[in-house]
Amino acid sequence: MEIGGFFPYEPTLETENNYISRTCPDADDVAHLMSGRCSIYYCLQDIMLTDKKRVAYLPAYDCETVIGCFVKAGYSIYYYDFDNNLVPQFDESLIPKISFLLICGYYGYSTFDTEFVKKCKKSGVTIMQDTTHTAFSPIGACKDADYISVSLRK
């Protein structure tokens, strides 16, 4: 089977893993979509109803399809870099300029600065966490995230 190819149906196990309740505190507000790209754009469509500024702060280390969602939605973009341990190097001086922050973990670990996320949230910045690489991490999702997006196929 090729990457990104067809996934045949398989019956679910009788024992539930409670993934949704662990990652989404409000499990009644969940949409199942075709891909991570669709998920991010779906969230952006909701955010754009109130976000007139449309300035995003995204990880410099991200795939083109994720960035494309923001371009398609008409967002201006700032990028944050990472150190050698994949810890984001956020610039606090950008908080007043941005309206949206995308956080994510890599290789199963969320290394972002939760205090920076809290400062953004307090300043009215919408927070989205992409949990594609940390979906099954026992740490769970960031409690300050307004939106959580995941591609379970990856």
Question: Predicted segment positions?
Answer:
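Conserved PLP-binding active-site segment in aminotransferase class I/II-type PLP enzymes
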Residues: 1-52, 73
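Amphipathic coiled-coil/heptad-repeat helices and related helical stalk/stem segments
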Residues: 16, 36, 40, 63, ...
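Generic structural signal for beta-strand residues in well-ordered domains
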Residues: 23, 32, 48-49, 70, ...
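Hydrophobic anchor at the start of a short beta-strand
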Residues: 30, 77, 127
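Short, well-ordered alpha-helical microsegments
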Residues: 39-41, 63-67, 110-111, 135-138
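Conserved PLP-anchoring active-site segment centered on the Schiff-base-forming lysine
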Residues: 44-93
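Active-site phosphate-binding strand-loop segment of PLP-dependent enzymes
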Residues: 83-154
